[in-house]
Amino acid sequence: MATACVIICGGGPNPALDQIDNLIKAYDQVYFVGADRGALRIVRAGYELDVGLGDFDSVSEEERQVIKAHSQEFQAFPSEKDDTDGHLALDLAMNRWPEADYVALGFLGERGGRLDHFLANIWLAHQPRFQAGLSRLTLLEAHHKVRFLEPGQHVLAYEPCLYLSVISLTPVQGLTIQGAKYTLPATDYASPQSLISNEYKASQEPVEIAFESGLVMIFWVNQV
């Protein structure tokens, strides 16, 4: 079965563009959606855009024309709107390619981005429009990778990282962590919890996460 990935580049500073080649090798088909200045960064990295969109208030008119020239489809929005450019891009990607995986670059702002944008991009997990594709969304930066887990059993294959953090966005029931340096028996949490700085074992065995209800984020962290 053919696999597809949509790479969405937001406007955060220094997105992990060096990860794109690895993604291209991993999938049969890769699509590019750029939001505002993120669109320009994709073009400058040498890739053509399937869709360039946003209000383009962070680029010059000349840069806007460059984006337009390298976009198969170009969508301009007013600067005063009830959405962020990044969320518009993700919404479009999930509707146009509903079976794909989604990798969002420049959404975490780990190197100087706005904290309010960071929180908006974490809390998008609660928006109904993103639910269908949430389990296939990865937020990827140079030192962090974030995925969202829904209730059930999940096996996290070993990945080189300093820390593996488990953070709930809601109350959770029956959360267990097995195979990690620090394990957790089935535990209920009545409020969101941050179980950070766990690790894979030296044996590099998978980590198993399970829970009965709630919403959980996994952070792979390569930063002290």
Feature-to-residue mapping (PLM):
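N-terminal beta-strand-loop-alpha-helix module at the start
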Residues: 1-66
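Structural motif
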Residues: 9-12, 107-108, 221
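A glycine-rich helix N-cap at a beta->alpha junction
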Residues: 69-78, 161-168
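Histidine-anchored nucleotide/phosphate-binding helix
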Residues: 20, 37-43, 89-90, 118-126
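Long, charged alpha-helical interface segments
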Residues: 142-144, 148-224
